[in-house]
Amino acid sequence: MNSLIPIFPLELVLFPESIYLLHIFEERYKKMINRVYTTGEVFGIVSVINSRISKIGCICKVEKIVRTYNKGEMDIYVKGYERFNTINSLINRDGYFESEVEPYFDNKSRDSEIIFEVVLSRFAE
């Protein structure tokens, strides 16, 4: 089943189970974060690479608002949960993207498992 969620494009890659500290300053994203935080909703972070928005992103949730500033800016912790693929996107009346998303599953092969094991062994040396 596909879901429509708010989208936050950023120049970073958010991975499942990772936690990031973000500074929210744009008016449209302050509205989005206030919405998802008060309702407990999830939202998606997609990477912006070379001015292009990725179709693959990570569903996340605001874990904590660390600090709020006089003009409504805020520092927040977000946690990634699972990856998604963007199907359709639109800009809502508050100016931020909302996208219809579906779960994204990596195609795993024996080659990728071998490469992963080699990389891990090099870090263990």
Language-model regions: role of each:
Residues 1-125:
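N-terminal low-complexity, acidic/polar interaction/targeting segments
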